[in-house]
Amino acid sequence: MRKLRGGQTKETRKQKQERREENLKIQQQLKTIVLPICGVFLMCIVVYVFLKTRPRFEEL
């Protein structure tokens, strides 16, 4: 049993199961929300750097 913060009571099976479910939910949100946002942000940086560093040909 795990001791809860700020108290003498210990964690019950139900509380432990709820905590596990919350952790799984957070991991799922990480995969569906945070990683795609980071991917889009990274792609924006790559495109910006590409556009700023490409050689520009002036017509003669």
UniProtKB/Swiss-Prot annotation:
- Annotated region described as Disordered, given as residue ranges: 1-21
Instruction: Give start-end positions of Basic and acidic residues composition bias.
Output: 8-21
Q: What is this protein called?
A: Single-pass membrane and coiled-coil domain-containing protein 4 homolog
**Membrane spanning stretches:** 32-52
The family classification in the record reads: Belongs to the SMCO4 family.
Which PANTHER family does the record cross-reference, listed alphabetically? SINGLE-PASS MEMBRANE AND COILED-COIL DOMAIN-CONTAINING PROTEIN 4
Classify the main location: membrane
Name one matching Pfam family. Answer: DUF4519
Superkingdom per UniProt? Eukaryota
Q: Which residues lie in coiled coils?
A: 10-33
Localization per record: Membrane
Q: According to its record, how does it sit in the membrane?
A: Single-pass membrane protein
Q: What keywords were assigned to this record?
A: Coiled coil, Membrane, Transmembrane, Transmembrane helix
